[in-house]
């Protein structure tokens, strides 16, 4: 069974071509490992080259497969602690229930979220409730699938203000090597994307967006080329003449290097260009 994507995953293939393989203006390192007892550890840290500010986070995950439970704990350098408990595929195939809590020791602030999603081969639905004593905010989404066509709706409702805060629609088509996605957010923001896998080595993507009542149209083209099983090149450009370049090299199994650069084509001689360096380690 091939589950229908969530609303946030609509057009994901096009987004990945634009976003993955880049890390402008920062030095970043990601590390993933797994203990003998099955506990997964993920940590990442990054430092911004323009401000020198550094931050990091640590995540541990433990799965109890017999009961469909996943326990996740998170911590970051802002001293925010998070705990997430998920229960998946036990009450029904494709059903996932999640409790997500956040605690900030410095301020004593506490918050939480209740999440539920149900995914099948022809539809997916989900909801989330932000727990707030002043009045929770309710989020919901649904996606229907039929012969490659996808139609989705996303909303959020602020119970404290009795106001609909988000009202989004999406329509798309998904084939094996081609994807088309369009969306309308709150009746004012319009956008679309096209993803095309030309062959086993080349992926391309086009992104277009504009806002009602504004002449500011955003347009971008991106491509990814796999030189071999270890090396890939990425490039993108938008109508603001910002040119992004990326190079990814698998140095050895579990070790990946990423180099990237952002060039301002309109002000090439003025400087202000950004470079990035990233390491991904997995053991």
Curated annotation (Swiss-Prot):
GO biological process terms, alphabetically, are: behavioral fear response; chemical synaptic transmission; learning; neuron-neuron synaptic transmission; sperm mitochondrial sheath assembly; spermatogenesis
* Transport found in the keyword field: yes
Query: Any idea which UniProt keywords this protein has?
Result: Acetylation, Ion transport, Isopeptide bond, Membrane, Mitochondrion, Mitochondrion outer membrane, NAD, Nucleotide-binding, Phosphoprotein, Porin, Transmembrane, Transmembrane beta strand, Transport, Ubl conjugation
Fetch the Pfam families from UniProt. Answer: Porin_3
Could you state a single Gene Ontology molecular function term? voltage-gated monoatomic ion channel activity
Could you tell me which residues carry N6-acetyllysine? Answer: 12, 15, 20, 90, 266
Q: Where in the cell is it found?
A: Mitochondrion outer membrane; Membrane
Reactions catalysed, as given in the entry: chloride(in) = chloride(out); K(+)(in) = K(+)(out)
Q: Which GO cellular component term is one of those annotated?
A: synaptic vesicle
Free-text tissue specificity from the UniProt record: Isoform 1 is widely expressed with strong expression in atrium and ascitic tumor, lower levels in brain and very low levels in liver and kidney. Isoform 2 is also widely expressed with highest levels in brain but no expression in kidney. Also expressed in flagella of epididymal sperm.
Q: Where is the cross-link described as Glycyl lysine isopeptide (Lys-Gly) (interchain with G-Cter in ubiquitin)?
A: 53, 109-110, 266
Report the residues modified as Phosphothreonine.
4, 33
InterPro entries assigned: Porin_dom_sf, Porin_Euk, Porin_Euk/Tom40
**For the modification N-acetylcysteine, which residues carry it?**
2
Phosphoserine found at: 241
What quaternary arrangement does the UniProt entry report?
A: Interacts with ARMC12 in a TBC1D21-dependent manner. Interacts with MISFA.
In the record's own words, the domains note is: Consists mainly of a membrane-spanning beta-barrel formed by 19 beta-strands.
PANTHER family in the cross-refs: VOLTAGE-DEPENDENT ANION-SELECTIVE CHANNEL (PTHR11743), VOLTAGE-DEPENDENT ANION-SELECTIVE CHANNEL PROTEIN 3 (PTHR11743:SF28)
This protein's name: Non-selective voltage-gated ion channel VDAC3
The organism of origin for this protein = Rattus norvegicus
């Amino acid at each position: 069974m091939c589950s229908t994507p969530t609303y946030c995953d609509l057009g994901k293939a096009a987004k990945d071509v634009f976003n993955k393989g880049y890390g402008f203006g920062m030095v970043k390192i990601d590390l993933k490992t797994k203990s003998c007892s099955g506990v997964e550890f993920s940590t990442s840290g990054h430092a911004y080259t323009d401000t020198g500010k550094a931050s990091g986070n640590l995540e541990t995950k433990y799965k109890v497969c017999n009961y469909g439970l996943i326990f996740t704990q998170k911590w970051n350098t802002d001293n925010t602690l998070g705990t997430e408990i998920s229960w998946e595929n036990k009450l029904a195939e494709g059903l996932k229930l999640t409790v997500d809590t956040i605690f900030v020791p410095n301020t004593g602030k506490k918050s939480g979220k209740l999440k539920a999603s149900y995914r099948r081969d022809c539809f997916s639905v989900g909801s989330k409730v932000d727990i707030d004593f002043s009045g929770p905010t309710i989020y919901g989404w649904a996606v229907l699938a039929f012969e490659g066509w996808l139609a989705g709706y996303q909303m959020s409702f602020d119970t404290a203000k009795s106001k609909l805060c988000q009202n989004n629609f999406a329509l798309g088509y998904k084939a094996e090597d081609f994807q088309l996605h369009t969306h309308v957010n709150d009746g004012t923001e319009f956008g679309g994307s096209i993803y095309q896998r030309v062959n086993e080595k080349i992926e391309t993507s086009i992104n277009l967006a504009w806002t009602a009542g504004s002449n500011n149209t955003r347009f971008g083209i991106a491509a990814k080329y796999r030189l071999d099983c270890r090396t890939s090149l990425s490039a993108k450009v938008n109508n603001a003449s910002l040119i992004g370049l990326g190079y990814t090299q698998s140095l050895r199994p579990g070790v990946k290097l990423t180099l990237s650069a952002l060039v301002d084509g309109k002000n090439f001689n003025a400087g202000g260009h950004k470079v990035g360096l990233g390491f991904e380690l997995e053991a």
